[in-house]
């Protein structure tokens, strides 16, 4: 009885006469070991990238957008074109909310504090304060450059330090087969 079932099963081709059977290639069926999973395969789209000089390049990207315009790229970046003097680094956030926040609240976080007076006095005081702060900053930079030298780096390599020895070292164990 079983033979007749198997014979009928293997006798049928599974397709109607005249058709060709198409087989798709499959990945080899391997046992996936622990920690050896297959990498994820991501779909990639063809994206037209418009560079800053107007040229268009087609690239493959995972971002599903047809066209992307770049503000700054290798055509107008001073790192890629060191011989061009007309290039300036463009801040992408210059018109953003972070820049507006810095403009509005930068006076709150400044080190120098001034008391509000009449407008003419504040203008004169602010100019004097700016000059004083510039002089102080220059002096601090000079002192900091002179104070820190190669000896400070060598002091980090002091021989009196000892390594802390505690705990057990992990040892590799061979798998028994």
Curated annotation (Swiss-Prot):
GO molecular function: structural constituent of ribosome
Superkingdom in the source lineage: Eukaryota
One GO BP: mitochondrial translation
Primary localization: mitochondrion
Compositional bias of kind Basic and acidic residues: 127-144
GO CC, alphabetical: mitochondrial inner membrane; mitochondrial large ribosomal subunit; mitochondrion
Region (Sufficient for dosage suppression of COX2 mutation) residue spans: 87-177
Keywords attached to this entry: Mitochondrion, Ribonucleoprotein, Ribosomal protein, Transit peptide
Location of the protein in the cell: Mitochondrion
Region feature Disordered, mapped onto this chain: 111-144
Biased composition regions of type Polar residues, renumbered to the chain: 111-123
Residues covered by region (Sufficient for general mitochondrial translation): 36-118
Family: Belongs to the bacterial ribosomal protein bL31 family. Highly divergent.
Subunit structure: Component of the mitochondrial large ribosomal subunit (mt-LSU). Mature yeast 74S mitochondrial ribosomes consist of a small (37S) and a large (54S) subunit. The 37S small subunit contains a 15S ribosomal RNA (15S mt-rRNA) and 34 different proteins. The 54S large subunit contains a 21S rRNA (21S mt-rRNA) and 46 different proteins.
Record text about domains: Contains two functional domains. The central domain is sufficient for general mitochondrial translation but not suppression of COX2 mutants. The C-terminus sequence is sufficient for dosage suppression of COX2 mutants.
Functional note: Component of the mitochondrial ribosome (mitoribosome), a dedicated translation machinery responsible for the synthesis of mitochondrial genome-encoded proteins, including at least some of the essential transmembrane subunits of the mitochondrial respiratory chain. The mitoribosomes are attached to the mitochondrial inner membrane and translation products are cotranslationally integrated into the membrane. Overexpression of bL31m suppresses mutations in the COX2 leader peptide-encoding and initiation codon regions.
Protein name stated in the entry: Large ribosomal subunit protein bL31m
Species of origin: Saccharomyces cerevisiae (strain ATCC 204508 / S288c)
This protein's encoding gene: MRPL36
